[in-house]
């Protein structure tokens, strides 16, 4: 089946204090007894105006085969928002999942100038980029054929 799980890495807003960071995903990853997801996709600031979704560094290093699969699907679907170029590594909710042995990637919208500013609102969203993200996710749900 398909599970939707919602986390916010900045649970308490203290990204400099790792005791209060990634709480939801750390709890989820620590309580997987009897349950093992095949893979996980984290959506992180996707769809912002001026952003591109590139190959997030931690995902590319630790889940390269799954990252290859997802970006190949995006290319096959002619989704231009997803650029198969290297991106910086991120400490985010995919990391506890990776540490738990789950193939996890962070689809990250790089170069989002409005992040954590008063302009970080609905007007900063690019509808076409959100739509491309939805097309990719729908494809992954209906046509998923990834094996570790």
PLM feature segments, named:
Residues 1-65:
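Acidic/histidine-rich catalytic neighborhood of metal-dependent amide-processing enzymes
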């Amino acid at each position: 089946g398909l599970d939707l799980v919602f986390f916010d890495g900045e649970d308490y807003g203290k990204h400099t204090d790792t005791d209060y960071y990634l709480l939801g995903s750390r709890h989820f990853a620590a309580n997987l007894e009897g349950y093992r997801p095949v893979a996980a996709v984290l959506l992180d600031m996707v769809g912002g105006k001026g952003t591109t979704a590139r190959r997030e560094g931690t995902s590319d290093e630790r889940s390269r085969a799954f990252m290859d699969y997802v970006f190949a699907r995006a290319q096959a679907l002619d989704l231009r928002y997803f650029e198969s170029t290297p991106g910086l590594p991120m400490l985010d909710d995919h990391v506890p999942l990776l540490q738990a042995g789950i193939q996890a990637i962070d689809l990250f919208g790089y170069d989002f100038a409005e992040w954590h500013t008063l302009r970080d609102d609905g007007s900063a969203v690019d509808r076409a980029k959100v739509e491309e993200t939805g097309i990719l996710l729908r494809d992954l749900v209906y046509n998923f054929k990834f094996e570790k």
